[in-house]
Structures are given as C-alpha cells and as structure tokens.
C-alpha cells in the first residue's frame, strides 16, 4: 500500500562543517522514536569511523521518521543527510534534487560561512522551501539576532519564523519537527499509474547484499521482483529487496511516488550505479530520463606508492575494495624510477584525496608516499588534437605543443575583516583575479577566480593560518584558460627525477625551483664526490645548489719533506673524484623523497 503523498515530507539539512547538522539529525531520530535511547550514539548517520572523527559527512545517508503532528495526523519524514564539503558537491546536488525542502542550520555563535552559502544556493536552484534553524543558542557566545540579520542580508531569506534550538541538549527540536510539517511542501508531482521513474540518489557496497541503492520514486511503483533498467548505462537488474531506513534497514512491500527508500538487485559494483541516474521498469519504461545526470569526473591527480615495494599487491587489492564503494575514485598502475611501482589516482578534490589516503593507511595498514597533487591540463597540439595531461612526467615534447590550458575555479572566502589584507595578499600571490568584495557586518566576503593548480598545493592551510582559523573557503569549478605554463624538472647529478617534475607558471618557476633545490640539499646525504642539484625548464637551468664532497685527508701520512709529494697525492685524489662523479650513482634515500614531496604540498 502506497502512502498518500500529502503526508510525506522529503527534506535535507544544509549547513557548514561543524554547525551541528549530524547532531540535529540524531535528535530528530531520537524524538520520533527511530532508535531506542540505548541504541543512540553520536552522529548515527555518519557510518564511517573517519566521518565521525573528522566530524564530516562523506556519503549521503537517509532515514525515514514517523511523526505525529499537533494536528493529530501522522507524517512520514524522509531526511537525507548530505555531505557538506565542496569535493562532494555533485552528491549534494543529487541529494537536494530528491527533496522539496531544506533545513538551513546556522551556528548562532559563528554566523553564515562560505559553504553554507554554496549549499543554500544549490537548494534554491532546486526550488526548495527553506526553514531557518539557529543552532547552539545555549552557548555564551551565541548572538541569534545578529545572525538572523546576517542571513537576511547575505542570503535574502526571511528569518521571522526562524527556529532557535540547541541540538546538543534537545532544546527547541520539537519546534523543528512542527516546522517541517507546516512550512515544507509535500512532493509536488507523482502518479501511481504512470510507468516507474525513480532517481538514484546514492549507492554503497555491502559485503552480504552487494550494492545497496538509495532511490527516490517520482512516478509509478517500485516493488520486489520487477526487472529495472538504469537509463544512463542501460544495465538491467531484478529487484531482490525493497525497504526503508529507520535508520535500521526494514523491508517493505513497495515504494510509491514521493517515497525514499533502498533496493538491492545483485549489483556487483558501485561503478554500475551512477548517482543521478534514472531507474525505470524494463517491461514498461518511462519516456524520458531525469535532467542533470553527469558521471563524476576526477579533478585532482596524484601518485600513491607503497613505501615497501612488497606491499604493491596489497595496495592494489585495497584500492579495488575502496572503489567498490566510491565510483568517483579512479586509479591506474604507474612506475617511477625513483619510487618504484605504484598508482596514479584521480580524486574529486583535496579532501577526497586525504580521505582515500587515510582510509588506505588506516583500514588496510599500508604505509604510502603521495606525490605532489596535480590537476588535469589540456594540451593543444600543433596537429590540431587536444591531449589531457594527468602526470607532468608524461608531458609531450614542447615543440609539438601550441598552447597549454589549466582549470580555474571561482572561490568564495569569508573572513573577519581584520584578516582581509592577508587574505587578499595570498590570493594575489596565487595569481588570483578579484571578482567582488562585500561586507556582512564585521565579516568580509571575497570572490576570486584562481587557477586550481595554485589551490591544490597548500592554499587551504595557508588561508587557515593567516586568518587564525577563522576564514572559510568554498569553490566551484569554472573552465579552462590558457596559461604560460612550463615543465620544471629536478636534476640530481645530471639525472632527472621523475617524481619531482611539475608544471608551474613561468613567473613562479624560479622561486619554487630554488626552494625545492635548497630542501633537497639538506635532505640528500653527502657522497665522496660533489653533487649538483638543479631545477631546469627544458635545457635552461633556473636554480642550482651543490652538495659538497666528503673530504678524506690523503696527505696525513706525509711528514715535512717535499711539497711536490703532497701535490701529487692531491692531484691523484682529484682525478679519482672526477671519475667517481662520472660513474658514481647518487643514492637518494626514501625519506628525502617523502620530505621533499611534503614541502611541495
């Protein structure tokens, strides 16, 4: 039996990191009896350890709550807990498209942050109704009235009916439930008699059930035994289970229009189920797919190598397992003269890269070296073709390239105005172009266009340190722009080190080359002969440092006597060193690479 859609509310919670989104979700689950008090734990919906520890949500989770409103009716509330971080922006947009309304949660002591803005605009793009919720009003530093003004100024939505709560203590949470029922709309469309049309909101891998697919039914009915087809990939599957999360998995007979639940259908890999795809019935398909579907594209690339070469097969198996659950993570085998066998991996952004690396190290006990992150460059060749470059070491011959394009982003930075000067200086230093600057109370909101290449190194860390942690940062991908980019190679004793080559803008090549040479000079141990360390662009050396040779005192055995005897011994030593330098190999310790690559970040 399907539920009357007038009694369904599908909503998500939009907030900046740490503004209390997952804690509010916990309280809603507790107050509607989704879990017993003894079963409650912090951040119920964040199932990965790393999500709980970093206090971030990575995968979208869902829960179905039954709420008896003050008017005596029982409503079904479907909450989709979305990721808040920019790397997962596409997952956020699909989760929002599955809902009709959002709770905008803002920390009453901190106010509007950059990611709040980005996610609010996405919610508005999906024509959501918004309920403003001010969280943490019990804190001594809370200023609800100031924050309400700020929300009206920056976002332009009415805050007269804003709900003031403390998700931690439970204060005011019942008012949030009432606001969801009275202020948010029910699903706008949906016809039981039309062919099945459902949106694939998210999917994850379960060792026993295979891939679990989170769906939002638009039209028709989804039930066990149907043969379904993914319209994006054309793959067909028989539905084995249909159910909902409360947040425990509970099987139901069917899901009707407006409902959100899960299905399993012997799907082997998450890569077969693309977020945003349309699911329909094979026997009687719907006419057109839902708009807005696009496969995830990696944005940042880096090499991951095991410190111990014997771990290579374990690393491959571990990456295969992670890919089961994360279709946006891609990898291929790569060899490096300096680091041995490893993988070239593609990620959605820097947080995604950190999370994958941390999960590999933590869940699979692997010790890894990550090479400097790089972005995807486009090479326009003289013969008219366009090549994508993921690894600077693979750059084609410069003579064949007519121009190089790099990806740019539009960054929104919110900072207290006393740090504004330092923030603007940092953006200028990174080749940024200012788009706008506005003030919201004592905070400044700056919009900059920046090359992604300059952001993937250490932009975020630098921004946090110059603003004492108060600035927040969010970005959207823009498009590719032509730039004066050159490949910088590092030569040690005349041999190029592939793991350290990088594409840089010509204006900062010398500065970056010099700092890297200085670092390597301190990291590579002395040999019996002198070692030059050089940074080069093509055949031109732009920076050089020299590691001096170890000196053995060959004249120690001579006492007094003729000076020519000493000179002869010194000349002989000089000849030997010359020969050694010609044939000797420089041993670069692994630790030097790790340190040098850290410096690169």
Curated annotation (Swiss-Prot):
It is a peripheral membrane protein. Signal peptide: none annotated. Keywords: Cell inner membrane, Cell membrane, GTP-binding, Hydrolase, Membrane, Nucleotide-binding, Protein biosynthesis. The keyword Nucleotide-binding applies. Its main location: membrane. It is an enzyme of class 3 (hydrolase). One of its GO terms (biological process) is positive regulation of translation. It is found in: Cell inner membrane. One of its GO terms (cellular component) is plasma membrane. It catalyses: GTP + H2O = GDP + phosphate + H(+). Residues 6-188 form the tr-type G domain. GO terms for molecular function: GTP binding; GTPase activity; guanosine tetraphosphate binding; ribosome binding; translation elongation factor activity. Its EC number is 3.6.5.n1. InterPro entries: EF-4, EFG_III/V, EFG_V-like, EFTu-like_2, G_TR_CS, LepA_C_sf, LepA_CTD, LepA_IV. It holds the Pfam family LepA_C. GTP binds at residues 18-23, 135-138. Required for accurate and efficient protein synthesis under certain stress conditions. May act as a fidelity factor of the translation reaction, by catalyzing a one-codon backward translocation of tRNAs on improperly translocated ribosomes. Back-translocation proceeds from a post-translocation (POST) complex to a pre-translocation (PRE) complex, thus giving elongation factor G a second chance to translocate the tRNAs correctly. Binds to ribosomes in a GTP-dependent manner. Belongs to the TRAFAC class translation factor GTPase superfamily. Classic translation factor GTPase family. LepA subfamily. This is Elongation factor 4. It comes from Bartonella henselae (strain ATCC 49882 / DSM 28221 / CCUG 30454 / Houston 1).
């Amino acid at each position: 039996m399907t539920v009357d859609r007038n009694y369904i509310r599908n909503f998500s919670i939009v907030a900046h990191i740490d503004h209390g989104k997952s804690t509010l979700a916990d309280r809603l689950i507790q107050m509607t009896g989704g879990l017993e008090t003894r079963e409650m734990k912090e951040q119920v919906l964040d199932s990965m350890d790393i999500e709980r520890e970093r206090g971030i949500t990575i995968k979208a989770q869902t829960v179905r709550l039954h709420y008896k409103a003050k008017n005596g009716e029982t409503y079904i509330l479907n909450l989709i807990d979305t990721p808040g971080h920019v790397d997962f922006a596409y997952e956020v947009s699909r989760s929002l498209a599955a809902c009709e309304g959002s709770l905008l949660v803002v920390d009453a002591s901190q106010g509007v942050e950059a990611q709040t803005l980005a996610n609010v605009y996405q919610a508005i793009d999906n024509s959501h109704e918004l309920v403003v919720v001010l969280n943490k009003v019990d804190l001594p530093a809370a200023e609800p009235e100031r924050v309400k003004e700020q929300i009206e100024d920056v976002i332009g939505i009415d805050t007269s009916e804003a709900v003031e709560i403390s998700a931690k203590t439970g204060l005011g949470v019942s008012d949030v439930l009432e606001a969801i029922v009275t202020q948010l709309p029910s699903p706008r469309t949906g016809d039981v008699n039309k062919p099945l049309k459902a949106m694939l909101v998210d999917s994850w891998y379960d060792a026993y059930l295979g891939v679990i697919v989170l769906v939002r039914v638009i039209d028709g009915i989804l039930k066990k035994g149907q043969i379904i087809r993914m319209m994006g990939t054309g793959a067909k599957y028989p539905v084995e289970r249909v159910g909902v999360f409360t947040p425990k998995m509970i099987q139901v007979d069917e899901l009707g229009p407006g409902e959100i639940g899960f299905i399993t259908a012997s799907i082997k890999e998450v890569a077969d189920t693309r977020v945003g795809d349309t699911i329909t019935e094979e026997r009687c398909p719907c006419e057109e797919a839902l708009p807005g579907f696009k496969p995830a594209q990696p944005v940042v690339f880096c090499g991951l190598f095991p410190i111990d070469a014997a771990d290579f097969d374990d690393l491959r198996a571990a990456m295969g397992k992670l890919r089961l659950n994360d279709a946006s993570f891609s990898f291929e085998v790569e060899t490096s003269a300096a680091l041995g066998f490893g993988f070239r991996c593609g990620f959605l952004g820097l947080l995604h890269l950190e999370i994958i690396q941390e999960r590999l190290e933590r869940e699979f006990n692997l010790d890894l070296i990550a090479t400097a992150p790089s972005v995807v460059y486009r090479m326009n060749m003289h013969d008219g073709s366009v090549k994508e470059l993921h690894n600077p070491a693979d750059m084609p011959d410069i003579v064949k390239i007519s121009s190089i394009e790099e990806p740019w982003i539009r960054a929104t930075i919110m900072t207290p105005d006393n740090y504004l000067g330092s923030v603007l200086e940092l953006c200028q230093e990174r080749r940024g172009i200012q788009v706008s600057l506005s003030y919201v109370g004592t905070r400044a909101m700056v919009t900059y266009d920046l090359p992604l290449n300059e952001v993937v190194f250490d932009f975020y860390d630098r921004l946090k340190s110059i603003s004492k942690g108060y600035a927040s940062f969010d970005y959207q991908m823009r498009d590719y722009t032509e730039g004066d980019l050159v490949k910088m190679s590092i030569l040690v004793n005349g041999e190029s080190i592939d793991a350290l080559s990088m594409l840089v803008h010509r204006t900062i090549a010398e500065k970056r080359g010099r700092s890297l040479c200085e670092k390597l000079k301190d990291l590579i141990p002395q040999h019996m002969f002198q070692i030059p360390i050089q940074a080069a662009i093509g055949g031109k050396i732009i920076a050089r440092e020299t590691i001096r040779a170890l000196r053995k005192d060959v004249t120690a055995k001579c006492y007094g006597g003729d000076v020519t005897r000493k000179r002869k011994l010194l000349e002989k030593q000089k000849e030997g060193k010359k020969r050694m330098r010609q044939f000797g190999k420089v041993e670069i310790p692994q630790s030097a690479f790790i340190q040098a690559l850290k410096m690169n970040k």
